[in-house]
C-alpha cells in the first residue's frame, strides 16, 4: 500500500519546490502516474482481498473507490488552473497541498483495517475540504456553507465514535478482517437499536440521507471546482463505503431498522429529483441530482442482498465520474459567463459546439442511458428493490422518468435557444478542458465494456 501512499506524500515537496511555470505540469503528471499505477490493484486473486499489512488491506469494494480517488486528483488539478490563475504562488501551492492531503486521507480511509483508524481518517478528510470550501469558494456565503458542512458531519459522526468504543469493549477487536467472522447476532434491545442508529447516522449524513442533506447543496454551490468534484465524486461515497463495511456487525437488527430509512430514501429520491426540475442554479441542480442518486445507494445497501450490493457499488463509481464531469462542465460555463443561473447561460451550443457534445454525453450518462454503468447500477438496485417489495417499482420508475426529465431540461436550457447578448465575446473551449472531459468520459465508456471490476465484493 505504501507504493501509493509515499508517492502521494512526495507530491508535497514536488509542489513546494517546483518553479512557477512548472507547478501545474509537475503535479498533474506525477499524480496521473500514481493513478495509472493504482490500476494494478484491480489484479486481485485468492480470497478476493489483498492484505498489505496489519494496517492496510484492499478488497473488491475498496479497490474501485481507491482507484477513483487517485484518478480524480490530476483531474481536479486540471480543472482548477483557471480558477487559481489570479492567486499568488504561495496560495496556489497551498491549494494544491490541500488537495494532496485530502487524497492521502482518502487513500488511508479506503484501505484501513482498523475501525478506529478508519474513523480518524474519515474525520480528517473534513479539514482539507473545509479549508478548500471556505478559502477558495466564490461568494461570501461559503463561510455559511462551511459551517453547515462541519456541523452536520461532526454531529453525525460523534455517536459513531461512542459506538465504536462500545464494540471494542464487547468484542475485543475492531479489525474488519476479524469482524467478518463474528457470528454472534445482536439481540433486539433498545441499547442495540441506539447503537445501530449511532453507527449508521454518521454515514447517512455523509451520503446524504434525504432530510439530512441540507449541507450538500450549500457546500457544492459555494465550493470551488476542485471542492465540488471531490465532494461529489468521493466524499459522498465514504458514506456508502462505511455503511457497507459496518452492516456486517449490525445484523439482524438491520432487517427491521431499515424500513423507515428505506421509505425515507425512496420518498427523498422522488422529492430531490422533483426539486431539480425547479432549479435555476446550475450547480444546485447537479447537487440535488447527487442526493437523488445517493438515495438509491442507501436503499440498496439497507436491503442487503448480493445484487443490491453490486448495484450500490456500480452506482457509486458511475455517479462519481458523471457528477464530477457535470460540475466541470458547469464550471467551464461559469468561467465564461460568470453566472451559475441557467437562463443567463443559454444557447451556448452555437458558441461552444464541442462543449455541447460533452454536455450531451454527460447528461445521457446522468440519466442512465444504456450501455453506461449508471444503467447497470440502477437496474441492479431496481431489481433487488422490486424483489424486496413489488410496490417500490412505482417510485423507482417515477424516479427514472424525472431523472431523464431534469437531465434533458439541464441540457436544453444551457445549450439550446437564443443566446443572450452579454455572452457574444466569450472564449472558446481550451484543450485543457476537452482533455479533462475526455478523461472523465473514458473510464465511463471503458467500464461499460467490462463492468464486473466495479461490482464489489459479492460478484
From Swiss-Prot:
It is a multi-pass membrane protein. GO terms for cellular component: mitochondrial inner membrane; respiratory chain complex I. Keywords: Electron transport, Membrane, Mitochondrion, Mitochondrion inner membrane, NAD, Respiratory chain, Translocase, Transmembrane, Transmembrane helix, Transport, Ubiquinone. It catalyses: a ubiquinone + NADH + 5 H(+)(in) = a ubiquinol + NAD(+) + 4 H(+)(out). Its main location: mitochondrion. It is found in: Mitochondrion inner membrane. This is NADH-ubiquinone oxidoreductase chain 4.
Amino acid at each position: 500500500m505504501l507504493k501509493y501512499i509515499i508517492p502521494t506524500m512526495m507530491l508535497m515537496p514536488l509542489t513546494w519546490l517546483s518553479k512557477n511555470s512548472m507547478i501545474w505540469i509537475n503535479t498533474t503528471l506525477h499524480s496521473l502516474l500514481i493513478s495509472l499505477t493504482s490500476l494494478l490493484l484491480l489484479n486481485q486473486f485468492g480470497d478476493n482481498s489483498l492484505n498489505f499489512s496489519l494496517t492496510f488491506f484492499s478488497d473488491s469494494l475498496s479497490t474501485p473507490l481507491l482507484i477513483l480517488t487517485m484518478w480524480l486528483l490530476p483531474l481536479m488539478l486540471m480543472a482548477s488552473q483557471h480558477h487559481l490563475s489570479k492567486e499568488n504562488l504561495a496560495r496556489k501551492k497551498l491549494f494544491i497541498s490541500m488537495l494532496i492531503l485530502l487524497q492521502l486521507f482518502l487513500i488511508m480511509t479506503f484501505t484501513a483495517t482498523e475501525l478506529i483508524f478508519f474513523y480518524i481518517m474519515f474525520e480528517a478528510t473534513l479539514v482539507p475540504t473545509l479549508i478548500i470550501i471556505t478559502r477558495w469558494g466564490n461568494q461570501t456565503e461559503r463561510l455559511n456553507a462551511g459551517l453547515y458542512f462541519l456541523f452536520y458531519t461532526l454531529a453525525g459522526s460523534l455517536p459513531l465514535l461512542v459506538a465504536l468504543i462500545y464494540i471494542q469493549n464487547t468484542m475485543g477487536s475492531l479489525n474488519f478482517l476479524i469482524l467478518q467472522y463474528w457470528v454472534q447476532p445482536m439481540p433486539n434491545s433498545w441499547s442495540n437499536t441506539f447503537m445501530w442508529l449511532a453507527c449508521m447516522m454518521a454515514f447517512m449524513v455523509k451520503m446524504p440521507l434525504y432530510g439530512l442533506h441540507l449541507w450538500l447543496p450549500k457546500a457544492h454551490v459555494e465550493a470551488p471546482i476542485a471542492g465540488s468534484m471531490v465532494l461529489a465524486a468521493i466524499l459522498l461515497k465514504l458514506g456508502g463505503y462505511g455503511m457497507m463495511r459496518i452492516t456486517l456487525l449490525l445484523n439482524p437488527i438491520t432487517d427491521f431498522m431499515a424500513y423507515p430509512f428505506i421509505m425515507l430514501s425512496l420518498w427523498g429520491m422522488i422529492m430531490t429529483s422533483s426539486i431539480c426540475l425547479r432549479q435555476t442554479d446550475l450547480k444546485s441542480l447537479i447537487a440535488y441530482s447527487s442526493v437523488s442518486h445517493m438515495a438509491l445507494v442507501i436503499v440498496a445497501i439497507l436491503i442487503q442482498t448480493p445484487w443490491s450490493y453490486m448495484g450500490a457499488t456500480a452506482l457509486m463509481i458511475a455517479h462519481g465520474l458523471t457528477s464530477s464531469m457535470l460540475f466541470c462542465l458547469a464550471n467551464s460555463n461559469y468561467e465564461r459567463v460568470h453566472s451559475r443561473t441557467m437562463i443567463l447561460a443559454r444557447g451556448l451550443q452555437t458558441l461552444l459546439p464541442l462543449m455541447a457534445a460533452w454536455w450531451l454525453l454527460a447528461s445521457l450518462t446522468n440519466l442512465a442511458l444504456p450501455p453506461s454503468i449508471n444503467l447497470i447500477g440502477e437496474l441492479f438496485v431496481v431489481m433487488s428493490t422490486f424483489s424486496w417489495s413489488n410496490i417500490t417499482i412505482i417510485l423507482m420508475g417515477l424516479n427514472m422518468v424525472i431523472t431523464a426529465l431534469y437531465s434533458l431540461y439541464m441540457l436544453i436550457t444551457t445549450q439550446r435557444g437564443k443566446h443572450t447578448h452579454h455572452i457574444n465575446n466569450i472564449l472558446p473551449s481550451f484543450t485543457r478542458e476537452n482533455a479533462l472531459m475526455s478523461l472523465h468520459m473514458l473510464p465511463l465508456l471503458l467500464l461499460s465494456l467490462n463492468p464486473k471490476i466495479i461490482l464489489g465484493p459479492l460478484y
